[in-house]
């Protein structure tokens, strides 16, 4: 999977004919890595805004109409919903980070076997290897994985979310954290997702059939309710005069940024995938993010007609001291 916008657009064009009935009928089936699938695998491009949600939804509606493409469009909107929900409740992210740090400092029994794919549960162990080797899992497999992690292996949900965030090419703070909370029963109180052997066998085409291996009657995880939503802070007014545009891994589509009236004098790029976890990010993720940033910087040079360079995190304080910097909202 090439981390460039043109590759994302090629994948988008190829999948557009499947965004209607083919997607709604086949989206739950996971044929396995390298096999033709009814899911798009566009999420790494959308997550870094190499391609935009609007482009994807517009393609679906143009090809199939909103009603026929409804299931596919809903999946795109889930990502936006998660980001908005977490932006209004930043304490949930802070609590998650604190729990991960404490959990990794003293990992519970069974954790090392789980992340090495040595649990003895065939489907789970296979998904661990697939995730590590490809940086991707089918969405249904992600739900099964999370449910087995939480309810069968009885491991903390936040350590599973951290494992995903380290390895997923589309790893996103909001989507990943809140999806794991939803499986655990923490997002919608009393509603948790339970992986069942029959369901896994059916939707993997019989590749896996973990009969008798799963806890299929668990209770939801219990934690205090999340805080009430609070308004997202207003974005500061842009400065006058020349500005430096800071691109980062959360938004690499500089062509669409609302910068009318601003004079972009240069572009700088920053990526910090290692900040996703106390254990950093997997090499696959680091390479994808670095490549995506280079692609975004290259397009920024063409769009604004200025120079662009990648900078390190420790260079930012000095840049912010001497230049007026604008950046996309994360």
Give short role names for the model-derived ranges.
Residues 1-107, 116, 129-133, 156, ...:
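Trp/Phe/Arg-rich N-terminal binding region typifying the photolyase-homology
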Residues 90, 119, 191-193:
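Proline-centered flexible-loop/turn and helix-kink motifs
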Residues 92-113, 183-185, 193-204:
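Long, low-complexity intrinsically disordered regions
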Residues 117-120, 124, 134:
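Active-site helix-to-loop segments that bind/position phosphate- or nucleotide-bearing substrates
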Residues 168-224, 326:
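C-terminal, helix-dominated tail/subdomain
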């Amino acid at each position: 999977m090439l981390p460039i916008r043109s590759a994302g657009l090629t994948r988008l064009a190829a999948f557009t004919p499947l965004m209607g009935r083919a997607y709604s009928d086949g989206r739950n089936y996971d044929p396995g890595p390298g096999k033709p699938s009814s899911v798009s695998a566009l999420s790494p491009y959308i997550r870094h805004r190499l391609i935009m949600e609007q482009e994807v939804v517009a393609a679906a509606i143009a090809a199939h109409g909103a009603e026929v493409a409804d299931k596919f469009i809903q999946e795109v909107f889930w990502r936006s919903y998660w980001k908005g929900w977490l932006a209004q409740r930043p304490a949930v992210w802070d609590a998650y980070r604190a729990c991960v740090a404490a959990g990794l400092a003293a990992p519970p029994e069974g954790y090392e076997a789980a992340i090495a794919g040595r649990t003895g549960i065939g489907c789970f162990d296979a998904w661990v290897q697939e995730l590590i080797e490809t940086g991707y899992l089918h969405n249904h497999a992600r739900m099964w994985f999370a449910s087995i992690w939480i309810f069968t292996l009885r491991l903390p949900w936040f350590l599973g979310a951290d494992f995903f965030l380290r390895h997923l090419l589309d790893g996103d703070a909001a989507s990943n954290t809140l999806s794991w909370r939803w499986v655990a029963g923490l997002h919608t109180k009393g509603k948790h997702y339970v992986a069942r052997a029959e369901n896994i066998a059916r939707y993997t085409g019989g590749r896996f059939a973990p009969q008798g291996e799963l806890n299929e009657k668990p209770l939801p995880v219990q934690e205090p309710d999340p805080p009430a939503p609070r308004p997202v802070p207003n974005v500061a007014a842009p400065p006058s005069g020349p500005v430096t545009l800071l691109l980062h891994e959360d938004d690499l589509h500089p062509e669409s940024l609302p910068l009318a009236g601003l004079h972009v004098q240069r572009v700088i790029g920053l990526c910090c995938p290692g900040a996703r976890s106390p254990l950093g990010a997997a090499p696959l993720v680091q390479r994808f993010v670095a490549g995506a940033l280079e692609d975004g910087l290259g397009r920024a040079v063409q769009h604004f007609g200025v120079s662009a360079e990648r900078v390190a995190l420790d260079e930012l304080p000095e840049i912010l001291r001497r230049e007026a910097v604008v950046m996309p909202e994360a």
